[in-house]
């Protein structure tokens, strides 16, 4: 009789409490939902490569023709990225800045940054000091991840192979974590006019689906 009561009490206690694994999963989901809400109430900064280091190198050695080629090629790519976000991204307002301003962003020298809209018009009214914004770019997703639910309990993370992707980061350029849909793979060899449209569209769809979850 005592043994039966013991097992009943044990079973009741076990079912009445979530395991550490479940608690960690709930915590991760709550953090991800909070990021989504903050994004909806804030804005997105898209980092564009301006090839400044490469262009400055050619200019240093008076190779103006090569510098011009690099600049024009990158401008065409950036134009397609701006077009993709304008056409498909509706989660929050989107603005753009160049990679050469990354140090200003990280050092919070926001007044030194050149931020523009999709039409390349300078935007000076944004409040970056609040930190209520996220950064996106076509780059590399290489964050560690929990590969299955069992690993959540003991905090074991395995390194994900770095992949070319559209990535969303925090205002401090840190990658978000699952289950937030923070990256979408893309084909760096695809045609310039179609390379960026698909990933941005898919990112918006994933954000919509996560918000409805």
Model-derived features with residue positions:
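Bacterial Sec-dependent N-terminal signal peptides
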Residues: 1-23
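Short beta-strand and adjacent turn/loop elements
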Residues: 18-213
